Amino acid sequence: MGCVHCKEKISGKGQGGSGTGTPAHPPSQYDPDPTQLSGAFTHIPDFNNFHAAAVSPPVPFSGPGFYPCNTLQAHSSITGGGVTLFIALYDYEARTEDDLSFQKGEKFHIINNTEGDWWEARSLSSGATGYIPSNYVAPVDSIQAEEWYFGKIGRKDAERQLLCHGNCRGTFLIRESETTKGAYSLSIRDWDEAKGDHVKHYKIRKLDSGGYYITTRAQFDTIQQLVQHYIERAAGLCCRLAVPCPKGTPKLADLSVKTKDVWEIPRESLQLLQKLGNGQFGEVWMGTWNGTTKVAVKTLKPGTMSPEAFLEEAQIMKRLRHDKLVQLYAVVSEEPIYIVTEFMSQGSLLDFLKDGDGRYLKLPQLVDMAAQIAAGMAYIERMNYIHRDLRAANILVGDNLVCKIADFGLARLIEDNEYTARQGAKFPIKWTAPEAALFGKFTIKSDVWSFGILLTELVTKGRVPYPGMNNREVLEQVERGYRMQCPGGCPPSLHDVMVQCWKREPEERPTFEYLQSFLEDYFTATEPQYQPGDNQ
């Protein structure tokens, strides 16, 4: 339920639009035009025809200069029109002598924006010159500078952020439309007795003359005017707009402008502060870089992999950028190898499910975590890359149940005999597709098999797959056609997806693109009668 303060704030006249709600499970991404309440929303998405929709073609890696598109939002395209005055959206503490500390609201002249994620700027308040992260600033008086503007995030991520604990009814954000170029979407947190907390989406269309509207009866010159209008009155929306959705501090792709291109760093620049875990091939630590920046450091036992091969693979890993992948920041390539990544507060998904707050999660949260992992793997799929070791132990969890994929690509480099034998004690047989375990044929489709096993880890809160069976028995039984039965508390429709992932023929397994779509819309399209108390 929404907080009392916000309920009072939007009561009275602001409730005028509450009678215009949509049916419990609209298939459209958007609520209807608030002045056109036909109620004709009955279609359920056809997941069998998912690939008939237009999708972006795969983008292969194209050499050292390749940086794929992602949700690390920079504004390099904004400055093309001669805009040089920018405003800080967040506080930033300098990490090296080359960059500037600044406060939210501070203004800058941009001197040089050719360095990609780091721009050279001069502060108008202090006169100091240095580098600033480009995704921490926006042009003064632009829509990008507004608290409520979230840019290029998808519908599902908008819902995740709006439904975070502590947000009230009427919390809102505006984002780029996923379906209509040049249009925007307004996403609002709502509440009613039938559905509880949920999010409604309204498309903001653009007039040929340049104005904006949700309904043609109310047109505005700017998005800012539209927002102010709906702050003052619901006017057919589910409720008045109350407060902008809180924004998390953006993720940086590099430790600093210095490590952008030269990201082999000296071991002495790292301080290992707290051991977070032990693995078969090393340890994971929480630490700091340069005494300023919190990081996670994976230390590998000497002999685990060739430093030369690791450095070559790390060149590719560094270029993979997506908000559902743990960002690789830097490496120490001499043994013992150190891998420096972003820090994730809740640790591995496996530990989180078994011993952390994950023990108390219900099915909707577990399915959403699966959808996040599928989104990250769909990106890896588009990039023509392979993970090779996808399981809950290699997924990391942050605040607000954010999940990110870690250790992608590293399994290929391990030189330990107990691992490379594939049936050895250290090899994750229970997660590995039979063609990969028996013949070494690792593909994105063997990752899909592993994802099906990971789904069982989620719904069983970290139980080891194939309970009661050892590795040899699993390999033999799977080859004979055995597949795990539906775990307790798991809906049959979710088990059906697992079984699809475990098809004998790799090409018959679904794509991660499909799995992401299926899981993101799972409770709308597959389990419309689900009640929150159904899964403990």
Curated annotation (Swiss-Prot):
PROSITE patterns: PROTEIN_KINASE_ATP, PROTEIN_KINASE_DOM, PROTEIN_KINASE_TYR, SH2, SH3. ATP binds at residues 276-284, 298. Phosphorylated. Keywords: ATP-binding, Kinase, Lipoprotein, Myristate, Nucleotide-binding, Palmitate, Phosphoprotein, Proto-oncogene, SH2 domain, SH3 domain, Transferase, Tyrosine-protein kinase. It comes from Gallus gallus (Chicken). There are elevated levels of this protein in neural and hematopoietic tissues. It is an enzyme of class 2 (transferase). This is Proto-oncogene tyrosine-protein kinase Yrk.
